[in-house]
């Protein structure tokens, strides 16, 4: 009976650990949704570039953070997507309730930051969408080194003209 009880306790502990790890690992669907949101709704690539290297779209000033070299942890990344970056940067806040009472950002409200509040986004995001973008950035961009042709094809699709030019050594 003692062995059975010990086995049940060990199994319960293993299942708890496995579910904890699974909860921290983004699902493939979350990453796919995050990619679509990064590309289309949030238009992150306009400033951060398709590869997240901070180069931006050809029409952007290219002054955004290089996400490939980011040292932000998950919670910090979520807060920046949700709240933007105060202080006159172009990084918008994607949570429409950010900076309000009860939804403080970086421990501050809109009254605390005044005219240094981040700009409004072109489209707001829901919590699930913010989580999905963070999952995509963490899975496909952060710590991945310089962008490759394979990265380009994963982002734009196989046969993309941009990726063909990248493969030929031309500027993106």
Named regions from a protein language model:
Residues 7-18:
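Bacterial N-terminal signal peptides
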């Amino acid at each position: 009976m003692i062995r059975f009880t010990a086995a049940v306790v060990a199994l319960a502990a293993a299942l708890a650990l496995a579910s904890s790890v699974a909860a921290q690992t983004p699902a493939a669907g979350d990453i796919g949704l995050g990619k679509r949101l990064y590309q289309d709704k949030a238009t992150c690539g306009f400033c951060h570039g398709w590869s997240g290297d901070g180069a931006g779209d050809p029409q952007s000033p290219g002054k955004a953070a290089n996400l490939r070299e980011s040292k932000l942890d998950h919670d910090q990344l979520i807060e920046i997507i949700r709240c933007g970056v105060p202080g006159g940067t172009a990084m918008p806040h994607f949570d429409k309730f950010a900076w309000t009472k009860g939804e403080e950002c970086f421990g501050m409200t809109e009254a605390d930051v005044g005219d240094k509040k981040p700009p409004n986004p072109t489209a707001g995001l829901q919590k699930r969408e913010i989580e999905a973008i963070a999952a995509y950035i963490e899975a496909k961009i952060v710590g991945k080194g310089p962008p490759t042709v394979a990265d380009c094809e994963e982002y734009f699709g196989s046969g993309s003209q941009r990726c063909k030019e990248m493969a030929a050594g031309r500027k993106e």
